[in-house]
């Protein structure tokens, strides 16, 4: 039986285009050399005993790494309360709403307020469902093994996202206070909802392709798509609740005095209290050293709404990005930012430093890839959005450390914030969204370039 499995594996590798080198396996001689390479001396035994009983990070932790990291910052925009995305991938939505909340509370002298993430998530999932189904219609003439079609079926819907999704969502659907539409189990723990929607969409997508293959007209496909979206809408309503079309809300000032009581639609509420032109007033920047700087890139199919905008960004060196970040914080504006947050992040104390964990010493090896190499090999990519809110500068005006407002609840030594070294930021910041008024004119002109279109399955995305 084992021999049959091995033969089948070799056959599948050959059919996939991999030439099987008869010398490529681990033979007895090589295995002997590998065994001999492990010393198993007193030092190895001590490390092995410790690792068998403890988490790797607990033993690799560098207790001195936190030295110099504190809450003293040259420029800091105070947080308006720590939010908690819980077991969901909605960091992008929490971050976008947190940036907006900071501005609204300051401009309107409001007390504590939080906007409903569940409301905007409802429409995010509805829009993403439509994006997938319409893509199935648009690509119906392509063979099923086409790379785009395969990618669509592999990724019918996600709970994650990025800033252009926020811009399209809020501009179209507005916002509501959290008191109007609160969290549910499935908004706070999205895994099962995502699985149900993915299964529903894959089946519906296959049905649309079958209809198209039999010669169905576009009008018939569009009508069928709408019926399918009715099923999606029902699933979302049952799990997240009915999104309000209007609501009555009492505005108070920071002292608790009533300012007004009005009835709003979500769009009216957004226009009156936010009014931000998220689509046109903000620019997304990326630090991707694996690609040419000072160029504009666009990711195909990387949008939340079918009639929305693909993800576009200007690729810049970190020094350029940090200058704009400092200027924004100087002027009291938080920023949407995204990171490879899992690398060298100490969740217990809320710090991010390249010195937090010494894996090299623990395992007697080195991990030497630079940022570009990590991107190219899929070792590093943006995984989490957070709100950039503070920077500390040295005597020469150079950044030493930064702080972000996270959305994992009030945890760690900094009450839900993460303090990071400038070196860590250089390695693991990927995206920053900046208001145009803090972007130099020569950088802003780069937007006029024709974007370089990247496929949805690009290694970084």
Residue ranges and their predicted role:
Residues 93, 119-122, 168, 177-180, ...:
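Structural recognition of the beta-strand scaffold that forms the well-ordered cores
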Residues 67-139:
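Post-signal peptide N-terminal segment of secreted/secretory-pathway proteins
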Residues 117-250:
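Papain-like cysteine protease catalytic cores
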Residues 87, 95-96, 100, 162-171, ...:
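Stable alpha-helical elements in mature extracytoplasmic
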Residues 77-89, 151-157, 307-315, 324-325, ...:
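Second-shell loop/turn segments in exported
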Residues 21-81:
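N-terminal regions that are enriched for targeting/export leaders
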Residues 21-22, 215-461:
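Active-site signature of cysteine proteases
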Residues 1-22:
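Bacterial Sec-dependent N-terminal signal peptides
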């Amino acid at each position: 039986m084992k021999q049959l499995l091995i033969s089948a594996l070799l056959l599948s590798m050959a059919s996939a285009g991999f030439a099987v080198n008869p010398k490529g396996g681990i033979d007895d001689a090589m295995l002997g050399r590998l065994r001999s390479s492990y010393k198993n001396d007193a030092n190895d035994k001590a490390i092995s005993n410790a690792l068998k009983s403890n988490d790797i990070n607990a033993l690799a932790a560098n207790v001195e790494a936190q030295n110099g990291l504190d809450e003293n910052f040259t420029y800091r925009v105070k947080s308006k309360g720590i939010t908690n995305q819980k077991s969901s991938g909605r960091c992008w939505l929490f971050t976008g709403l947190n940036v907006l909340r900071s501005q609204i509370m300051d401009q309107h002298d409001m007390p504590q307020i939080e906007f409903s993430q569940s409301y905007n998530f409802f429409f995010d999932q509805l829009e993403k469902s439509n994006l997938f189904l319409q893509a199935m219609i648009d690509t119906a003439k392509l063979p099923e093994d086409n790379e785009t079609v395969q990618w669509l079926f592999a990724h019918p819907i996600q709970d994650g996202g990025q800033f252009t999704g926020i811009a399209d969502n809020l501009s179209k659907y507005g916002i509501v206070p959290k008191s109007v539409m609160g969290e549910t189990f499935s908004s706070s723990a999205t895994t099962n909802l995502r699985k149900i929607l993915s299964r529903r969409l894959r089946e519906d997508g296959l049905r649309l392709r079958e209809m198209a293959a039999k010669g169905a007209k576009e009008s018939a496909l569009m009508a069928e798509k709408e019926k399918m979206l009715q099923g999606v809408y029902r699933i979302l309503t049952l799990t997240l609740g009915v999104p309000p079309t209007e609501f009555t809300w009492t505005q108070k000032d920071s002292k608790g005095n009533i300012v007004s009581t009005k009835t709003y639609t979500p769009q009216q509420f957004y226009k009156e209290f936010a009014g931000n032109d998220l689509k046109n007033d903000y620019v997304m920047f990326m630090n991707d050293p694996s690609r040419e700087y000072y160029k504009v890139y666009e990711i195909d199919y990387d949008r939340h709404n079918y009639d929305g905008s693909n993800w576009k960004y200007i690729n810049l060196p970190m020094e350029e990005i940090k200058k704009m970040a400092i200027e924004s914080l100087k002027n009291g504006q938080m920023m949407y930012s995204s990171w490879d947050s899992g690398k060298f992040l100490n969740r217990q104390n809320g710090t991010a430093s390249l010195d937090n964990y010494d894996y090299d010493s623990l395992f007697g090896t080195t991990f030497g890839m630079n940022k570009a190499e990590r991107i190219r090999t899929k070792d590093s990519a943006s995984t989490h959005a957070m709100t950039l809110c503070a920077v500390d500068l040295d005597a020469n005006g150079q950044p030493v450390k930064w702080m972000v407002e996270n959305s994992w609840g009030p945890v760690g030594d900094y009450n839900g914030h993460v303090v990071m070294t400038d070196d860590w930021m250089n390695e693991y910041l990927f995206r920053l969204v900046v208001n145009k008024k803090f972007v130099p004119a020569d950088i802003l002109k780069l937007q006029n370039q024709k974007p370089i279109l990247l496929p949805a399955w690009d290694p970084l995305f």
